[in-house]
Amino acid sequence: MRTVKNGLQGWTGVLALVLALVQVLALALACDQTRVFNMVFSEGASQLHQSGSSDTHHTLTHEETRDEKLGYQVEATKFVIHSMEAWATFVETLAGVPEGDGSLLDNCAVLAHSETSDANSHSVTGLPMMVAGGGGGRLRPGVHVFGAG
């Protein structure tokens, strides 16, 4: 999805497209039309902005001061929160599709991750990743792994 070319630089426009894509992907998986996909919310140097602000996500990662109490950049982090909320909607959609004795989610493995572990430095050390789904019984749910790097 090329947000600038499509004229959807604001998060609201991108979110509407993502939510439509969530439905299409869920149907494609349920109908066994695909088994592998990639969903990207914006390009690496994101030009997305919050409604009412001209500051882009990428600019905020470089220029926004880190909140000392919280330990992160509040405005830049909003973009990650939006992305993860959309991912959660996708996971919930898959969980709502019956398949066999369970759900489509029970038979999938859906990976989500952020581009960086720290927006300001663009570090990938300790990159947060999540996997949802049961992988057809091959994955054990509820496991937290803290990797060293």
Regions found by a protein language model. Name each.
Residues 1-149:
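Ligand-binding pockets and gating/stacking loops
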